[in-house]
A protein has these predicted regions:
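Conserved acidic
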Residues: 1
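Concave beta-strand-loop units of leucine-rich repeat
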Residues: 12-24, 33-50, 61-77, 81, ...
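Short, contiguous, helix-prone interaction/anchoring segments in small proteins
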Residues: 52-58
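Core hydrophobic positions of leucine-rich repeats
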Residues: 82, 107, 131, 217-218, ...
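Long, acidic/polar, low-complexity amphipathic helices and coiled-coil-like
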Residues: 104, 126-131
């Protein structure tokens, strides 16, 4: 029995390294069952060859590649491992190495990429053009640098459903009916066109968007979930369409004062408000005007937190972070 037997017997996700010497039956079973694995740092060539045979017929396989500086002459390192695994559909790249990653040319080896995530130590001029060969990408996540406008054709030419970027310039994007989830981590430009660009969006997340000050565009969206985190320009919650919205999170928006329109959201089930200027009486009123399942609240004042906990218990509403 393989020496790695005990390591992998009870885990749900397999992680292979340059120290991996063989693939036990338990490891192979887990790989096939979960349709995913992680490769950390590098992996011996013979293991890669075995792995390629194991996953070649698995539809929807996900590979997580962690790039780091420890390497071995006996292992295949960096993104070169992709040349052995052309049939993966989902790829996450985490760059932990000291040298910034400057290219992703190895994606040329992949036949049919469906989702792509990259994060960590990336060169600000990294070339994303290898993504242009694909036309079935449904999820794109690039969070640790700005995804340049010159690569927006990649978004326009794929059926993107889930998009997460630091900066989004809507004027450079085509109308996309497929878009369901949008996460913006720093800057949203031309926000007033969001409803026309992505008419079917149902989840919007805005984080640290310091230039946003007019939030009326939110009133045009048929959202199921809205997350706003650390947005200083948010002073009042705009009128939102209430038919579909079930989850609303307003976190660390320190200038927020007015939540009166929240009372109209009769289908809302999950609400979170933290670190705001909202008067506690207005927070208390939420319990009487909405039928929530979960209401998470955090104030800078301990007394308000204590009063809120008592209200949550009284009204039998969960008080936990979402």
């Amino acid at each position: 029995m393989s020496q790695e037997k005990n390591t992998y017997t009870h885990i749900n996700h397999v992680r292979l390294t340059m120290n991996t010497r063989d693939l036990s039956d338990d490891v192979i079973f887990s790989i096939k069952k979960n349709k995913s694995l992680s490769i950390y740092g590098g992996i011996p060539e013979n293991i890669l060859l075995d792995l390629a045979e194991i996953i070649k017929d698995i539809d929807g396989f996900k590979l997580i590649v962690i790039l780091e500086d420890n390497s071995s002459n006996d292992s295949i390192n960096s993104l070169d491992i992709l040349s052995f695994l052309p049939n993966i559909h989902h790829l996450d790249i985490l760059v932990h190495q000291a040298t910034p990653l400057s290219h992703i040319d190895a994606l040329d080896h992949i036949n049919d990429l469906r989702t792509f995530t990259i994060s960590g130590n990336l060169n600000k001029n990294i070339d994303f053009s290898p993504l242009r060969k694909f036309d079935k990408i449904s999820s794109l996540y690039v969070n640790d640098l700005i995804f340049p406008d010159k690569y927006y054709d990649i978004i326009n030419n794929n059926p993107i459903e889930n998009l997460s970027l630091r900066k989004v310039v809507l004027a450079n994007l085509d109308k996309k009916n497929s878009m369901k989830n949008l996460e913006v981590l720093n800057e949203l430009i031309d926000e007033q066109t969001l409803a026309s660009k992505f008419p079917n969006i149902n989840h919007l997340s805005l984080t640290n968007c310091r230039k946003l000050s007019d939030f009326l565009f939110l009133s045009c969206l048929n959202l199921e979930r809205l997350d706003i985190n650390t947005v200083k320009g948010l002073i009042s919650i705009p009128k939102l369409k209430s038919e579909t919205l079930h989850t609303l999170q307003i976190l660390n928006c320190q200038n927020l004062e007015d939540i009166s329109y929240i009372y109209d959201l009769k289908n809302l089930k999950n609400l979170a408000i933290t670190s705001s200027k909202v008067d506690f009486q207005n927070i208390s009123d939420v319990f009487f005007k909405l039928s929530l399942q979960n209401f998470y609240f955090l104030s800078n004042k301990n007394k308000e937190n204590e009063m809120f906990e008592n209200l949550a218990i009284k009204h039998k509403v969960n008080n936990s972070a979402m």
